[in-house]
Regions:
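Internal, well-ordered alpha/beta segment that forms a basic, Gly-enriched binding/recognition surface
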Residues: 113-211
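Short active-site loop/helix that positions an aromatic residue
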Residues: 363-377
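N-terminal regions that are enriched for targeting/export leaders
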Residues: 1-86, 160-165
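Aromatic-residue-lined binding/catalytic grooves and analogous aromatic/hydrophobic interfacial grooves
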Residues: 8, 173-320, 328-334, 339, ...
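Charge-dense polyanion-binding interfaces
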Residues: 379-411
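Histidine-anchored nucleotide/phosphate-binding helix
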Residues: 91-108
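Active-site-adjacent bridging/hinge elements
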Residues: 67-79, 188-189, 332-347
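Glycine- and acidic
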Residues: 78-87, 194-201, 347-357
């Protein structure tokens, strides 16, 4: 555990400091820090369009009533959990992060998830994750039950086609599996083959109700938790950017269409986590502003041209994207580009003031993104917007990464302390009970951190 603590301290000192400082707090008290601070100055742009878009999308994918619940949540507290990959949250870190964030919510639990990740990412969106082995063996080990075909697994979630009922594989049909996959057939039927899921036209839209259905399966109404709303952040952000390109004073329009500002952004954040690393010879890591999407739905890393008036694909010399409003709007509509993580936070947090709860890495990189944007604006003489952005932002304590919910570990030596539970593990154990939920709410942060360290 000491080495794990040192690992977090070396890579995410802000996250570990936040956990340690809040050690004596209950998780419920700690979660209060995920809420927006109404006393802060207003950001450069109002968030009305973000709230309206999220509520309308929720009404379309879930129900009009849930759309109104999400609207009430965001209007009373402009916050969202942004740590997860878009899919079904079987992963222990994502599922338990959802539970912790839910402690800060009243009407709905807003998840704005990253869809610009391939289908074979760590969250395993094409199947179920079950706990396996012990945390000491590796940082996180799980057994994967493939529910959907493996084709297109390198394609991005945001542009992945919808699956059909015939493509859903029941766990009992998989060879060489122990007994519990047969019990999981009921969970798969309730989540993957639900009519609301199968009527959606894209995997992106299927993942939203699937996550809510899993939430309902694992968490009974008696626990009195708000409903879960899971939306693709890249899709939401793309719609906002398209509108911002038509607004002369919007931050994103200036960032995308003003080459000196784009160049200053490149310099300010070059080499930072979740941004990009590159030089005149090329791009070594990340992408600049957008991800390109190739003909197979896979990601293309983009670098700026020398004049910062276009973006060029690193792996495809013939792929070029002029940075003008008409071309960008069309490319977003046709899903030939997806907003990067940086551009997402520039659009919703820097410009509109959305408070984003995230994981241990976001605790470090989001404040650096905000500082980088402000540095670039001041470099270009835009001191006023930089001051407003800096004044409206306060770092959010880390959310995803604590694993307070433990279940027995029959296949390893952790029978006393248990193993971090994912959604399927908890479902197999009978689901969340009101008593367990209250116990979680009153657990201490330092105890949850100690239980989580073997997984890092």
């Amino acid at each position: 555990m000491t080495s794990a603590r040192d690992w977090i301290r070396s890579r995410c000192p802000e996250a570990l400091a936040a956990f340690e400082q809040a050690g004596a707090q209950t998780l419920a008290d700690y979660a209060a820090g995920f809420g927006a601070d109404a006393a802060l100055p207003r950001p450069p742009q109002a968030a009305d369009d973000l709230v309206e878009l999220a509520a309308a999308t929720c009404a379309r994918l879930y129900s009009p009533d849930l759309g109104q619940a999400l609207r009430r949540e965001l209007e009373s507290d402009l916050h969202a959990l942004t740590a997860n990959h878009h899919g079904v949250d079987f992963h222990p870190e994502f599922f338990q992060g959802d539970l912790l964030f839910a402690m800060s919510c009243r009407h709905a639990v807003p998840l704005f998830n990253c869809g610009a990740v391939p289908a074979n990412n760590v969250a395993y969106p094409r199947g179920i994750l079950l706990g396996c082995g012990t945390p000491e063996e590796v940082s996180f080990r799980s057994r994967k039950l493939p529910i959907l075909p493996g084709r297109d697994r390198h394609g991005l979630i945001s542009v992945r086609p919808a699956f059909t009922a015939a493509e859903v594989i029941l766990p009992s049909q998989l060879s060489g599996q122990p007994e519990e996959p047969h019990a999981l057939d009921r969970l798969v039927q309730a989540v993957y083959r639900h009519p609301r899921v199968l009527e959606q036209q894209t995997f992106r839209d299927q993942a939203s109700p699937m996550n809510a259905l899993l939430w309902q399966q694992v968490i009974p109404k008696s626990c009195d938790l708000p409903p879960l709303v899971s939306l693709d952040m890249q899709w939401l952000c793309g719609r906002l950017i398209t509108a911002d390109l038509e607004q002369p004073d919007s931050l994103v329009r200036h960032l995308l269409l003003h080459p000196p500002l784009a160049a200053a952004i490149w310099d300010a954040l070059n080499g930072q986590r979740a941004c990009w690393t590159g030089d005149a010879q090329g791009l070594q890591r990340g992408t600049f502003l957008f991800w390109g999407v190739d003909g197979k739905g896979r990601a293309l890393a983009l670098r700026p041209a020398c004049d910062f008036r276009s973006l060029v694909a690193v792996r495809d010399a013939g792929w070029r994207l002029p940075l003008d409003a008409r071309t960008l709007g069309r490319a977003l509509t046709e899903e030939r580009i997806l907003p990067s993580l940086f551009l997402y936070f520039a659009t919703v947090t820097a410009a509109r003031g959305l408070r984003c709860a995230g994981g241990i890495f976001q605790t470090s990189y989001l404040p650096r993104m905000i500082r980088g944007i402000c540095t670039a604006l001041r470099h270009c003489g835009a001191d006023g917007p930089a001051t407003r952005i800096a004044g409206a932002f306060r770092p959010c304590p880390p959310c995803t990464g604590l694993l307070p919910l433990r279940l027995p570990c029959p296949d390893g030596p952790l029978r006393q302390t248990g193993r971090g539970a994912g959604a399927a593990d908890l479902w197999l154990a009978g689901g969340l009970s009101p008593a367990l939920w209250q116990s979680l709410r009153h657990s201490r942060v330092d105890h949850a951190l100690a239980a989580s360290l073997p997984y890092h």
